[in-house]
Amino acid sequence: MYMSTDEVRNAFLKFFESKGHQIVDSSSLVPHNDPTLLFTNAGMNQFKDCFLGAEKRAYTRATTAQRCVRAGGKHNDLENVGFTARHHTFFEMLGNFSFGDYFKEDAIAFAWEFLTETLKLPKDRLLVTVYETDDEAFDIWNQKVGVPADRIIRIGDKKGGKQYESDNFWTMGDTGPCGPCTEIFYDHGEHIWGGRPGTPEEDGDRFIEIWNNVFMQFNRHADGTMEPLPKPSVDTGMGIERISAIMQGVHSNYEIDVFQKLIKATAEIVGCEDLSNQSLRVIADHIRSCSFLIADGVMPSNEGRGYVLRRIIRRAVRHGNKLGAQGVFFHKLVGVLAEVMGSAADELKKQQAVVEKVLRIEEENFGRTLERGMVILNEALDALEGKELDGETVFKLYDTYGFPADLTNDVARERDFTIDEAGFEKAMEEQRQRAREAGQFGTDYNAKIKVDAQSEFCGYTSTQERSDVVALFVEGEETATLSAGDKAIVILQETPFYAESGGQCGDSGVLKTESGLFQVEDTQKLGNAIAHHGVLVEGVLAKGDQVTAIVDAERRAAISLNHSATHLLHAALRQVLGEHVAQKGSLVKAENLRFDFSHLEAVTAAELKEVERLVNAQIRRNHTIETNIMDIESAKQKGAMALFGEKYDDEVRVLSMGDFSTELCGGIHASNTGDIGLFKITSEGGIAAGIRRIEAVTGEAALEAIDAQARKFEEKLQDAANKAKSLEKEIQQLKDKLASQASANLIDQVKEIAGVKVLVAKLDGADNKALRGMVDELKNQMGSGIIMLGNVADDKVGLIAGVTQDLTSKVKAGELVNMVAQQVGGKGGGRPDMAQAGGTDSSALPSALASVDAWIAERL
């Protein structure tokens, strides 16, 4: 029997719910607290701690339809996607799980019942495999379920492999829960090439694995040892795409309903008539992984999960380009995907606008260089004497044009070439080494200046210090002395001036000598030195002079308050929006603060209000802002967050505000959170795909912002009230005018029935009040007659009937309007000379009005 993919999903979940299982929502594609996984790649990932006995849940049986991604890391299907019938970057894994509840016998019985009774698969099309030494599973299949012994295949360890290295001994990764498994295969028929599992021809497509039942008995440690789990458990997985293909009578996963709708939509968008084109399959697969990854918080980037996402997007865009796509196209498939995925796309539907925007921007950015990069790649392939493209060219395409190596490999493979992967990796490592070497130096505020001096910062506890001048620079050149009016950089041996770092702007102030005054406008890092940028206002200043360095204490205090508020803001955002929020940049000034962070969509007014509430609550608690020096590992164990883009030494400063915020920070802060006074967000907006920016003020500036906002609201409210009154007056005048004009036009439609004037008309855009006015106007113009008017507004029918007094003995308006109303799903009534009604079936209005003439004729 045919079942849609959505029906298969629902049938599976309902079946196991009837067997006492708790239906658990799919977890995020980003594994929670599991650094061993790049992406969620199996249904059991979210239950890992349950299998280990480290987590107790309110249920011991669970069932899920888990979204999974396999692209990057150990489980990487990217290169095969689109070129085989069953490889995908994204798939759904149906699963049922037992946490120390039932074990092999029930698991096998459940699987067999669902397949043969719920889905009604022919038993003679199914065969099973068990681990070679798992006699218990063999006996259950054979003696209790009744599967013939010749349809049960024992699978041992791979030749030359390690113990337990078998298709029928499952591991999640190098570590974690594992155990023997039994797999169920479906026989697609003799007309398809392929052999039974365990034979040399097993890689054929005749016998397809549809369900894997893993019997979790061990926890595998990094050294390879197997520790028995506290209680044996069960983890099963069945790819929804494979079982849907069987239920829909097709062989390839790409022929099922979900993929066919995506393939057809893609073909229509890019203008491709050949629905069997492999590029259409690639795009249909990739829109699934990309959309759901973005919806789960992954953003395109050049590292980690973000880079895998970027690779998939760019691979899809390249295949669209190959099909002749004009302009951006990929993001247009998100809406189709949200529709075809049914109940699995609830969260995607909420995030649809954000997902579309991220994909569109990424495609636009890559599209600018794709065409040129393809020209260079094809020229390089044309010039090859052999069959391998060198690693340097592959690296150039990556470095200059953003071509991931696997995309280059795709193009090369299509032309029967390979790429030098080792050479590419060598070039990549050389680039990483150059970056490491460059990263050893501080920011060059002026690239021409090279300074060997080293400054010591002593400003955490002081804003004034005596110090010696160790270097002077004017226009990038070192000099021995400064004269009044010189714009220069002064390097001191010790300084209380904070150099810009971690988003906190540099200090300003003055350097005083007995004979001169240097105005410090900004402070920056210069190698290992601290550079005071400014102008010599009076006198002279020479290398070796002793100065009194005085920081602008009032400005410093304002900056420190805003910096502490930034930490509170960061923590509050993570509480309100989620732990996916990560700092992407900040700027802390005396006037205000700016904070950039990762988030997929605009922060709502309610969320901003809650963030403000949390921050101000911490301010009122007046936490002591504690600073502790510790090694980086201890800081991480304490849960300290590291700031975006910052490089830390082995010893770090850990800043804590109660138990609300703990961050690594080398900046200047207030003594207590209460010093901040008040916190007010002044703006929130997007600055890039998936990156939001909040600007805020504190203290007196926050009070001023609140007052200004209140005044602005009052002005807007008054303006709105005035405009509303004016518009209401204009609208009524227009309605009266339109009614009068319409009445004049309708007179031409008057006809006679048995010597009586009759007007029946349908008017669009007029409300009931206007219709009543028309009826009165028409009565006056006709002198004697019967009027029936109808209109449709907001898909609802409005009806008005009018009869002059001389005719009410024969025709009553209430009866007339009720006759028409009954035909449009309504009812009504009124006086003999005027009546009104309503209805719900707007499509029936024309035929209902057409029946009026005959009805009137019968009564005259």
UniProtKB/Swiss-Prot annotation:
Catalytic activity: tRNA(Ala) + L-alanine + ATP = L-alanyl-tRNA(Ala) + AMP + diphosphate
CDD domains, per the entry: AlaRS_core (cd00673)
Annotated compartments: Cytoplasm
EC number of the protein: 6.1.1.7
GO cellular component, one term: cytosol
Region (Disordered): 824-843
SMART domains listed in its UniProt record: tRNA_SAD
Highest taxon, organism lineage: Bacteria
Cofactor: Zn(2+)
Residues where Zn(2+) binds: H563, H567, C665, H669
GO BP: any one term: negative regulation of DNA-templated transcription
Domain notes: Consists of three domains; the N-terminal catalytic domain, the editing domain and the C-terminal C-Ala domain. The editing domain removes incorrectly charged amino acids, while the C-Ala domain, along with tRNA(Ala), serves as a bridge to cooperatively bring together the editing and aminoacylation centers thus stimulating deacylation of misacylated tRNAs.
Name by which UniProt lists this protein: Alanine--tRNA ligase
Taxonomic source organism: Vibrio vulnificus (strain YJ016)
